[in-house]
Amino acid sequence: MGNQRECGVLLPISSLPSKYGIGCFSKSAYEFVDQLKAAGQGCWQILPLGPTSYGDSPYQSFSTFAGNPYFISLEDLIEEGVLTKKECDAVDFGSREDDVDYEKIYKGRYKLLRKAYERSEISKNPDFVRFQQEQAHWLGDYALFMAVKDRFGGIPWTEWAEDIRLRWNNALDYYRKELYFEIEFQEYMQFKFYEQWAKLKAYANKRGIRIIGDIPIYVAMDSADTWANPGLFKLDENNEPTQVAGCPPDGFSATGQLWGNPLYRWDVHRNTGFEWWIKRLAHCFNMYDVVRIDHFRGFDEYYAIPYGDKDAKRGWWEKGPGMDLFRTVSYRLGHKDIIAEDLGFMTDSVKRLVEESGYPNMKVIEFAFDERDTGNASDYLPHNYNNNCVVYTGTHDNETLLGWFADITPEERHMVREYLWNFHDDEKGICRNMIRLVMGSVAGRCIIPIQDYLLLDNKARINQPSTLGKNWKWRLKEGQFSNELQKEMLILATRFGRRNWTLDPEEEK
């Protein structure tokens, strides 16, 4: 990361303001980039962009390579002439501008996207043909996977008919012919997703704003990745998992966390020169400027739980690939800007891996005052940082700063006030002080969720782990990111040496 000081904002694409029910690559996204630039910000951190499954979590995606069709701008398709404004306005996408109604989005968006595809004559587009060729290593399998999944009523691929579940050649040939137009529809949506995303990213980069992407260490069991590459995962001869991922019991959970993702066969990956991982990361760095890798400790040791267990109590630790993977990444791809998400209890060997990789790790100020901590709360206090880290007030999994301060114990609130040496401000004043604290820290990069700048409570929380129903829904309302707030953020960014000084393209002229 070097000695350059940066700051940025965390906001998922889905949380952008939008006319049609969910944040996407529409004009609102470009306006948000302009607002970030006016606020002196140099980074925009987002969440994974893959197509989401039934829980709507971007960390449980149908593909690690594909993009979420929800993010395709309908406004752009109207301008292309493949949809009309009247058609889009007639669809019920939900009534709340600060909330995503995923059921209505699912029903409405795909109908419109199918109309756009049918009118597009996409097979005659040379750019589409080029896209198919360039993305051949994943696109065909993904499109077939989604087409077959739709044919079988959306059930997981592990419940499909045996011939296609086990990818017998005659079954693959049959479904490729039988579902030709459905497959092309899936490929069309990916083409539009990547076409629109490339334009938005270029717009941001031109204004000095780098995109920080996010990838989970694991893929979902019900994904094109596991279906198309079963040999890379711990599956049996019927392609059922033998072990799944999670976290052991700790001070926060007596039964641990059962994530259910299939585990990697690291010996197979090593024997292939980590080819799948090289393709995955190369793909990510075509999409993003910086990549945050979730659960980085899993590359040192990962927690394996017998498949079928109801909790994580009977799991055990196994060794991951360690530096072998990242030496290969460096050799094949060159130096890349990676953030190692190393939150939680860290062993000495995990710390050594992060240090040897050279990647900046993460600091979350909310973790610095936790009485339940298992031993490394002081690591999150700013006086213990070095330059090679990224500091956050909170992540997508955390309470908002205001919600957090309201919910912690009186003893913890006293610890915060004592550290800030502030015994008189109200809760919002304390949150402003916390933002100043991390912005003024020695950390090379500082990322703050937009909700914390807005001083919003936990109604604006993005995700509460291990819960269902209310997650991934919050949206920024039109006008909330005000000119006044942008000016305040600009002053902070300038004062603490983090300002994005890139000239606007118009100013350069």
Where are these regions (language model features)?
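Catalytic domains of carbohydrate-active enzymes, especially glycoside hydrolases
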Residues: G2, K27-T52, M287-Y288
